[in-house]
UniProtKB/Swiss-Prot annotation:
Protein's recorded name: Stage V sporulation protein K
Chain positions recorded as ATP binding sites: G99, N100, P101, G102, T103, G104, K105, T106
Source species of the chain: Bacillus subtilis (strain 168)
PANTHER family assigned: AAA-TYPE ATPASE FAMILY PROTEIN / ANKYRIN REPEAT FAMILY PROTEIN (PTHR43392), AAA-TYPE ATPASE FAMILY PROTEIN _ ANKYRIN REPEAT FAMILY PROTEIN (PTHR43392:SF2)
Gene Ontology molecular function terms on file: ATP binding; ATP hydrolysis activity
Amino acid sequence: MLERAVTYKNNGQINIILNGQKQVLTNAEAEAEYQAALQKNEAKHGILKEIEKEMSALVGMEEMKRNIKEIYAWIFVNQKRAEQGLKVGKQALHMMFKGNPGTGKTTVARLIGKLFFEMNVLSKGHLIEAERADLVGEYIGHTAQKTRDLIKKSLGGILFIDEAYSLARGGEKDFGKEAIDTLVKHMEDKQHEFILILAGYSREMDHFLSLNPGLQSRFPISIDFPDYSVTQLMEIAKRMIDEREYQLSQEAEWKLKDYLMTVKSTTSPIKFSNGRFVRNVIEKSIRAQAMRLLMGDQYLKSDLMTIKSQDLSIKEEASGSA
């Protein structure tokens, strides 16, 4: 029912970009058509409806959300083809996630694990998070064993390696290369038993792939995670505040927006941690509000709920990782 299918580059990589693709229908029209069709088959597609509900809690990322539906559609139709005795491509579902810190990469990985478990693509759907230190050992053979152990824990689920390019930073003699070689071998030997997601900054991930040309073809799905706009960051802040049963005063809201505009314009994108940055500001502001109330003698419901301008933590919070 969706007009736009997943598009492929010449090298077979699924091209999932979250900005500005032309479509036959407008996004609103396509979504309306899609929802109408889904409503007719609600019982059949209950898994997708549940995932969509969880994705609706994520601010922005509209293209990513549509593409998750496309991956669902592709798997679902392949299952129907298999039932009819038609050929079904046994394509691996290993992925690359490219984006700056705090843009939702880990959250989306968890959702994909849940979706694939419900669709019987993965037997467990759990997420194992790892970084260089979890894979690279201290002597010859140690790295391969650590990597194999991590893959074993990931069987039936997703192995999510953050800042994956750090595995290639030490040169030919670095044990990181041994980790890469071990991952590649198991991606082939056990390609339908687990899903490997490599994540990190876009530029570094592209450079990492250029140094390891054989890797790119092994990751058929690549998803870009753009930075949040100030408007989206404010929406994230309001949702965090609401979830905790607080509210921002008008002055606090203005101050936070001005602060986010300043930080966004003066901080390098790779050092700004997006949603995590906002969360840190909100959590510190809640503690500051508690200190302010402790020094006073009023504990009305409105006092306990309101974050005032002076409560806002607006020191430099701009660093963070994936």
